[in-house]
Regions:
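Switch/communication elements of ASCE P-loop NTPase nucleotide-binding domains
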Residues: 1-58, 217-355
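Solvent-exposed, amphipathic alpha-helical segments
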Residues: 51, 172, 179-182, 359-369
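Coupling/switch segment of ABC-type P-loop NTPase heads
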Residues: 89-208, 342
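Acidic, Mg2+-coordinating catalytic modules of nucleic-acid enzymes
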Residues: 25-27, 124-126, 131, 143, ...
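A short acidic/basic microdomain associated with nuclease active sites
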Residues: 211-215
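Conserved P-loop NTP-binding catalytic core
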Residues: 46-114
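Generic structural signal for hydrophobic residues
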Residues: 196-200, 280, 337-338, 380
């Protein structure tokens, strides 16, 4: 299941915005929303979540809804829905997509529904039903510990990654080890542990982390134990804020086992080193199977890791209406240096501190006016040289311009 189009009307600051996630007859697997504060990034994520939560929706007249989505279903999903409808005692006529979502909701909350119900049939034909996973920006990371090694998670259609969910991470890892021990009877417990460790570390390999999962504590808590390159060991609660953010957010999504699902992540760059920001989307893509990932970000490092067709730059018109640029409306983003992304994609006028940029511009103007020998030029140049150093690219280019000007003016005077 994937979103093909989003249409939001009169939700917070968004008056009327339509975004198409279909490019060249293919639904995008990764969508990156960017823009200044107040441009509607988080509102879009929340509106998508609310749509599946039946908020602000008019199913009889979708065009009157505050949020309306065009949903793309794989052929096997369409077939499963049709078969479930045939076997249930509910439908007499044509079913709607909203009935499918309602069935997923009902199955989440009521496990005692009768066998002939549409909900049971949906569960029967969808061994792994799709999920909506929302990862908000603000999460409080408290102490976590292993509560059980037999963690059971019932299916839920709408999932929010919050501190309560994150508390289950140690229990999830311990349960994963126990589960593998029951199906891999020929392996020793040490081999089972190594298998779990490799499975989890494999998610983060692309980040080249200094810290890796090593195993479990020897006491009854069986806490996940990490080790750094210096050989120092510590449990998950002693990770740095960036490491903890990375592991808890990512493993929370993995714990939900998304397949054919939609994952909404607000500001994944929080507390992450720029090197990790450049590769974090690849980490999320390795979790689960055939998911659609929609991200809201301020990070130029994340924007530089995807193609411009995956990027939607949100901006506010003079009349207050929020619009979006994408694809051919943007410069190429993938693989570009950060300063290019900041200027060409995010619209930043300069990557320098405004005062320094202003002083450089004044130097350029003095050169253009042939005032490079004046006291004003020499004083400004000396000040900037002391601040920026003699390897600064802009000062080097100004030097080159001065030399060219001197040569041209010298030739003119000699004639």
């Amino acid at each position: 299941m994937k979103i093909e189009k989003v249409h939001i009307k009169n939700v917070k600051g968004i008056k009327d915005l339509e975004l198409s996630f279909k490019k060249d007859d293919k639904i995008l697997d990764v969508i990156v929303l960017a823009g200044v504060n107040g441009s509607g990034k988080t509102t879009i994520l929340e509106s998508i979540k609310d749509f599946f939560n039946n908020k602000n929706i008019n199913y009889d007249e979708p065009e009157k809804s505050n949020a309306n989505l065009d949903i793309f279903l794989e052929e096997f999903e369409k077939k499963n829905i049709e078969e479930a409808k045939k076997k249930s005692d509910y439908f007499k006529g044509k079913s709607k997509l909203s009935d499918f979502f309602n069935a997923l909701h009902l199955y989440s909350f009521d496990k005692n529904i009768k066998n002939a119900s549409y909900e049971i049939q949906i569960e029967k034909y969808f061994k792994i039903p799709p999920k909506i996973i929302y990862v908000p920006a603000n999460n409080n990371f408290g102490e976590v510990e292993t509560e059980t090694s037999t963690l059971l998670r019932d299916y839920e259609f709408i999932n929010t990654v919050d501190s309560e969910l994150m508390e289950d991470i140690p229990s999830y890892i311990a349960t994963r080890r126990n589960y593998l021990a029951t199906i891999e009877e020929d392996l020793t417990m040490k081999e089972i542990t190594n298998k779990v460790v490799d499975e989890i570390n494999g998610i983060f390999n692309i980040l080249e982390l200094d810290v890796k999962l090593k195993g479990f504590s020897k006491d009854e808590k069986t806490m996940p134990i990490f080790e750094n390159s210096a050989g120092e060991e510590f449990d998950i609660n002693d990770l740095s804020s960036g490491e903890k953010q990375l592991f808890l957010r990512t493993l929370s999504i993995k714990m939900l086992e998304p397949k054919n699902s939609i994952i909404l992540i607000d500001e994944p760059e929080l507390s992450l080193h720029p090197k990790w920001q450049q590769r974090i989307i690849e980490v999320y893509k390795k979790i689960g199977e055939n998911n659609q990932i929609i991200i809201a970000t301020h990070s130029p490092h994340i924007l530089g890791s995807v193609s411009s067709e995956n990027i939607f730059i949100l901006y506010r018109e003079e009349n207050g209406k929020i619009e979006a640029k994408t694809g051919d409306e943007l410069y190429s983003s993938y693989g570009q240096p950060i300063d290019r992304v900041l200027k060409d994609i995010m619209g930043l006028e300069s990557v320098r501190t405004p005062k320094i940029e202003k002083d450089l511009e004044e130097l350029r103007k003095l050169v253009d006016e042939d005032k490079y020998d004046t006291k004003e030029f020499k004083e400004k140049y000396s000040e900037l040289l002391e601040i920026l150093g003699n390897t600064d690219e802009d000062l080097f280019l100004i030097d080159m311009d001065v030399k060219i000007k001197q040569k041209v003016n010298s030739n003119v005077e000699s004639k």
